[in-house]
C-alpha cells in the first residue's frame, strides 16, 4: 500500500533566468573607455557626455574617466568626465 495517494502532475514549475540588467558602474567610479556603465531594456537612462548607446540600449564609455549620473529635464543621464566632478 502506498503511504500517500497518487500525486499527479503539475504544469507549473518553470522560470526564466535573470537578465543581469542594471548599473555596472556607480556614480563617481573611474573606468576605462569601452567599459559598460548600464545594461537596460529601453532607454531608462539616456547617454550623456562621452557615453555611447549600443543596439540593446546598453550604455558604454567612449573615453577614460569618472561616471556621473545626472538628472536634466525629467530625464536621467549617464555622463563621463575626465576630471572628477
From Swiss-Prot:
UniProt cross-references to InterPro entries, sorted A to Z: Ribosomal_bL27, Ribosomal_bL27_CS
Residue ranges of the region described as Disordered: 1-22
CC annotations in GO: cytosolic large ribosomal subunit
SUPFAM superfamilies attached to this UniProt entry: Ribosomal L27 protein-like
Superkingdom assignment: Bacteria
GO molecular function, one term: structural constituent of ribosome
Record GO biological process: translation
Keywords, alphabetical: Ribonucleoprotein, Ribosomal protein
Family the UniProt entry places it in: Belongs to the bacterial ribosomal protein bL27 family.
PANTHER family: LARGE RIBOSOMAL SUBUNIT PROTEIN BL27M (PTHR15893:SF0), RIBOSOMAL PROTEIN L27 (PTHR15893)
Protein's name according to its UniProt entry: Large ribosomal subunit protein bL27
Source organism: Mycoplasmopsis pulmonis (strain UAB CTIP)
Amino acid at each position: 500500500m502506498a503511504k500517500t495517494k497518487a500525486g499527479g502532475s503539475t504544469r507549473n514549475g518553470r522560470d526564466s533566468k535573470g537578465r543581469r540588467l542594471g548599473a555596472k558602474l556607480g556614480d563617481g567610479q573611474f573606468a576605462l573607455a569601452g567599459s559598460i556603465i548600464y545594461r537596460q531594456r529601453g532607454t531608462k537612462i539616456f547617454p550623456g557626455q562621452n557615453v555611447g548607446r549600443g543596439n540593446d540600449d546598453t550604455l558604454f564609455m567612449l573615453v577614460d574617466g569618472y561616471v556621473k549620473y545626472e538628472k536634466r529635464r525629467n530625464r536621467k543621464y549617464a555622463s563621463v568626465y575626465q576630471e572628477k566632478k
